[in-house]
């Protein structure tokens, strides 16, 4: 994390992620070393294949030049044969590394073959020179010294860098030893010439620089490869997580909605998230849609638990949830067997539809058989638990509307006249029997069932009489004998969820199996990772990025290794260069070496000969200081979290460093300056030569046989080696466009070739050659061209790895965004299924099929029903708008005491206040075990704090009643809007009946196939009765609720003794509301704990806040006014 250090920050976290030590430790931490080792073996095999092609090309060109340019070919047949033979031996020895099984068992062979190949080429090169020294008195220079060192560091399969360094130093030492023995002719002359002008120290510095360049390439290559590997690992993890998350999201949606409804909803949620992030809040972008479909020819089953009220008031919360979970779980499993889709259950009511998702000609039979099966199940549950319960079931066939309305706590539901008829058949039915209509009977196999006429209560029901519906009673299925029934019940019991709470969590073996599958998929993806920039498919325009599939052309790399998508290419070039410090330290090291060589090799005495090299060396040291100062500060202070105050100079250095890393133009300018200044340093050496004077001195030497002065002109092989280092340096800078580096290297090569063949052809021609009678200028040119070719090939490999790595990072960011979007949508969906306080519980506990229940001492429950609302398609559109407005009000009841929407039943809106885990008297033991000890203790402390004052919990009644009044205001405003629309003014009269009751409530999640959160208890039953017995335009409350409201200063008028089913006659009250829809006040003895709760939010203020927040409420008002 960034640490505040005085006036600036030392943020080294991103730079540290590109350090070799960090990447290696990260691989070890993720236990990826074995996979990385296998991937690196594949990489080295691709490097070897590249080296084979390169070495064959170099050997062929070298031998062809020898045979084409030398007239006395007999003398060079030995050289040609030795070169070809050595190439064959190298390829033969190194080819064994392509045998995967052998290398897997004998990894030591990779290093051993590298040593053998290197020393073979060294001895062949030295043998050729020594042979001609003794056989033909030719003093020859070596040809493969630079080439072998490059080969060791860049192409040979040496996994550990220390091994490559030791081998390269050995090769360098052998060549220096050859120079001492055969060129300097003994250690005495070597010592005397070591620090002489143009002496041996120049060659030693040259070899040291070659090794530095090789080490740099190894470090940079290992860093890039490890970074790519880790990025790929993260990408695969994100892809697997996203795949699982999408599967989870689909399962969640399918558990509440059929696919034809869930898919548009899923896309709509994700689209809204994206638009919100983009700041799009237009009317068209956020219009409400109504996800409702028409389904003809279906059968509707309504089932009601007889004596349910007694059940909820006598059982403990744990026992109640367990019984309901067992019962409804059995129903869900039976419905699944008979292809009937459960819609929802409402306390004691369970209803479902056959033929909804897929047309089913046998829908009536399936519904009736399911009804009889449900009766059998409840009989078994009654016997198991010793309960006095039974089942009353009604079935009707016809048409219906199905879908989702509202915008909070989304639930799939059904509407229509035939749905109402099915409900009436259930309420007028006989316990233990299936009550069906004539429409259902017409679709039944009548010979299968025992059918009787319907009860008298049904014949006298006004709705059934109005539509002339005749009903029938079915008591049993004649085709299902007791043995088959018992067998089916046993099967259901074996998979029933009644004991889900006792089931163990996922076993360790299952976890290990999942981990094994994950690692196997990782290994398979790693095996697909590309390893080479040279691919026939790439030449055809097909590029693969380890996906196993061809990617679109706009993401491909062309033959120049640039993205064909210019936007992607620009993004790649604008990356921060975290490898800059390594490039600049290498440049400084090589630059200082070039300055040293220039000072040792030049004979001119002039101010520019010293000022320019000194200036170049100074600037390079300053750039190196800027590049490494941040690393130094982090090593000294940041790593150990040592507090330190940085002065202005340090902050200035930090800012310059960050500016360089983040600016491509600045880095290119620095790069070009270093290349040009280094080339000028070499030019000083070359320009110190007086060509005419050298030619005359050389002629006089040949005529008069005296030794020429050593420093009359530059040493050609010294300058050639300098340019070779410069070409290496040209390609060392990371995150400089490869086209720029290639262009600079080509210009350097061409400029030097002009010097060789034109400007100083005489000097180069009379320098030491590498083969007898082989023109020296050809030897110089060949070495420069080989160096350029090696560096260009290696740079393409590094650039390819960088481009693939970048493409993966881009894909990773896309996957992370997609994963974040999916995760966000999952949370939204969960919060629209379950109350927010148990979403985490569902993810942690219910996903493992564990029971969950809660017990609350004080909860206020509200039922609100729209009066005289016809359930046709036009009315459903209006109902959707009204319910959405009610849902919007919930946004203003999220503080302290939260109002939770429970469900919608037809035109009835059910909500509760006080369902907060902090107020829960008890929860399931599984929940407590799932909470960490610290969090659990804090949670218990909060509960005790709230439980110490029972009066504080009574405030939920005031909040719930305030929300109910806001609903009445919202409906009044909506009704005004509908009155201005000709087609909608007669849909509803805008009246609502509301009932509220408060007290102890039990809550939990039940069901086998769908997570359903519900509440039970006397307040739930009483609130429903208050609504059904209430008056339109009033809030009907119980005596206990009215007493609490009066304490908060709200008048409640006594209505009288009201008959309530299951309770008889009880006193009830109407909340005092004036004509302006405000509470009628009275003297208050208590006040809301949060003052903002004392001011009830009106619809007008709701719209004002909603417009400011671009909420959905303002959209609804706009939609209503524009209809």
From Swiss-Prot:
Recorded hits in InterPro entries, A to Z, give: A/G_cyclase, AC_N, Nucleotide_cyclase
The UniProt record lists the EC number as 4.6.1.1
Bilayer topology reads: Multi-pass membrane protein
Transmembrane annotation, as ranges = 48-68, 74-94, 107-127, 138-158, 164-184, 197-217, 582-602, 609-629, 668-688, 720-740, 744-764, 773-793
Where does the UniProt annotation locate this protein?
Membrane
Cite the GO molecular-function annotations of the record.
adenylate cyclase activity; ATP binding; metal ion binding
Organ and tissue specificity: Expressed in labella.
Gene3D superfamilies the UniProt entry points to: Nucleotide cyclase
Cytoplasmic membrane side: 1-47, 95-106, 159-163, 218-581, 630-667, 741-743, 794-1123
Q: Which ranges of this chain reside in the Extracellular compartment per its record?
A: 69-73, 128-137, 185-196, 603-608, 689-719, 765-772
User: Effect of gene disruption?
Assistant: RNAi-mediated knockdown in sugar gustatory neurons does not affect sucrose response.
**Enzyme class, spelled out:** lyase
A biological process term (GO) from this entry: adenylate cyclase-activating G protein-coupled receptor signaling pathway
Q: Which UniProt keywords apply?
A: ATP-binding, Lyase, Magnesium, Membrane, Metal-binding, Nucleotide-binding, Transmembrane, Transmembrane helix
- Binding, ATP: 346-348, 392, 903, 1014-1016, 1021-1025, 1061
SMART domains on file: CYCc (SM00044)
Write down the Pfam families for this protein, in alphabetical order: AC_N (PF16214), Guanylate_cyc (PF00211)
- Provide the reaction this enzyme catalyses: ATP = 3',5'-cyclic AMP + diphosphate
GO cellular component, as recorded:
membrane; plasma membrane
Residues annotated for Mg(2+) binding in this entry: 348
Which ranges of the sequence are coiled-coil? none
Tell me, in a sentence or two, what this protein's role is.
Catalyzes the formation of the signaling molecule cAMP in response to G-protein signaling.
The family note in this entry says: Belongs to the adenylyl cyclase class-4/guanylyl cyclase family.
Q: What protein name is recorded for this chain?
A: Adenylyl cyclase X E
Q: What is the lineage of its organism?
A: Eukaryota, Metazoa, Ecdysozoa, Arthropoda, Hexapoda
Q: Which gene encodes it?
A: ACXE
